[in-house]
A protein has these predicted regions:
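Intrinsically disordered, low-complexity N-terminal segments that are enriched in acidic
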Residues: 1-87
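Hydrophobic/aromatic-rich core segments of domains that either
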Residues: 184-211
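Eukaryote-specific, cytoplasm-facing alpha-helical/coiled-coil scaffolding segments in long proteins
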Residues: 37, 173-174
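Proline-rich low-complexity regions
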Residues: 26-28, 102, 196
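Conserved aromatic-histidine-acidic binding/catalytic patches
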Residues: 11, 132, 174-178
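Acidic low-complexity segments
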Residues: 74-173
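Active-site nucleophilic cysteine motif
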Residues: 137-140, 144, 175-190
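Solvent-exposed loop/turn segments at secondary-structure junctions
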Residues: 83-85, 176, 204-207
Length: 211
């Protein structure tokens, strides 16, 4: 498989006004996988406080900077990582009936504040699966994916990344949004249909061989 090395750099220049400024920047995942390997992050600038940390309550890495007093506020944060191409050949997929779901995957079947699995979410998921006559986890995932592609759209007017409130989206019938909305819509419907699913966000840093 082809391996590539990338450097992702933030260059931040905050306004000089006010007595205090704080900065949070998301960083690449430091938990190496079979297709992504972190080689660390470095920073430079004039922050009063600077540290590499994790988002509270999660394992997601971040950079935190704080400036006390007015004046220039700059920070440059660089992260280096390697990626390895991967493909999954679904032609050879076979369902193992009665196979146990790994403990680390079970949490991807649970409801969250933004991903309720009852009410309209469950009703919609079961309707999609029934209409597609989907039985295996792969068939269900494919049916839900196709439904999301056919019925949702990216709305450039959505603020930020969207709220990911799929219950409100389904109740209103407005399935437009941005990444958090569309990703969470698929994840919620998949979980409601009994298929483990999770959000996985990232930054596109190269051309895709598949899209």
């Amino acid at each position: 498989p082809r391996t590539q090395t990338y450097r992702v750099t933030y260059k931040v220049d905050l306004p000089a006004d006010g007595n205090k400024a704080r900065l949070w920047l998301p960083l690449p995942d430091i938990n190496d996988s079979a297709h992504q390997f972190s080689q660390g992050s470095v920073w430079s600038g004039n922050a009063t406080i600077a540290q590499f940390d994790t988002v509270p309550g999660t394992a997601s890495p971040m950079f935190y900077g704080e400036w006390r007093g007015g004046g220039p506020r700059t920070a440059t944060v660089s992260s280096v990582g390697k990626t390895t191409n991967r493909t999954v050949d679904l032609q050879h997929y076979s369902e193992q009936r009665g196979a146990a779901i790994p403990s680390g995957v079970k949490r991807y079947l649970q409801a969250t504040k933004r991903i309720p699995l009852d009410g309209i979410v469950r009703k919609t998921a079961l309707s999609i699966v029934k209409e597609a006559n989907a039985h295996s986890p792969l068939q269900k995932a494919q049916a839900i994916y196709d439904w999301v592609v056919d019925n949702s759209y990216r709305d450039p007017e959505t603020r930020g990344c969207g709220r990911g409130d799929i219950k409100s989206m389904l109740e209103s019938g407005n399935l437009g949004g941005k990444c958090a909305d569309l990703n969470t819509l698929f994840v919620g419907l998949a979980r409601a249909a009994g298929v483990p699913a999770r959000d996985n966000y990232g930054i596109r840093i190269d051309e895709s061989a598949a899209h």
